[in-house]
């Protein structure tokens, strides 16, 4: 599979970072995965969805409930952080499609395994896995 060009990945990440967020807190985070071993581990965490390992790059989006909760309390923790991370991922998706890249929204995964694989803080909540690349024709 062809690799996603660095300038295209940069555009995808810039689009994601331009997404609005509650109170402009940006209570979201992203991990960029290119390592094949890590992608294979994510396949296992995502219930065997093999295409994740085949993608050139995999973006994993997280909500940061505590960051939002410090300003907005329980509503920030349970709603705003989730909305922020989802919009963040959606902007990345839209930019990838605009660049004629193939991507698939993966929402079926074991949260704890994803956090363990990517060594994230315990309060980060995985929201979506977005494998990006060029589809086989």
Where are these regions (language model features)?
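A short coil-to-beta-strand element that immediately follows conserved catalytic motifs
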Residues: 26, 102-105, 125-126
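Small-aliphatic-rich amphipathic alpha-helix that forms the alpha element of a beta-alpha
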Residues: 16, 59, 76-117
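Residue-level "edge-of-site" marker
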Residues: 29, 109, 128
């Amino acid at each position: 599979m062809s690799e996603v060009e660095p300038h295209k990945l940069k555009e995808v990440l810039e689009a994601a970072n331009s997404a609005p967020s509650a109170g402009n807190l940006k209570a979201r985070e992203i991990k960029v995965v290119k390592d094949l071993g890590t992608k294979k581990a994510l396949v296992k965490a995502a219930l065997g969805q093999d295409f994740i390992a085949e993608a050139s790059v995999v973006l994993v989006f997280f909500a940061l409930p505590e960051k939002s909760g410090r300003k907005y309390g329980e509503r920030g923790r349970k709603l705003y952080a989730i909305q922020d991370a989802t919009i963040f991922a959606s902007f990345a998706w839209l930019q990838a499609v605009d660049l004629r890249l193939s991507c698939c929204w993966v929402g079926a995964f074991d949260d704890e395994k994803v956090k363990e694989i990517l060594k994230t803080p315990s309060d980060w909540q995985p929201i979506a896995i977005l494998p990006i690349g060029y589809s086989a024709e």
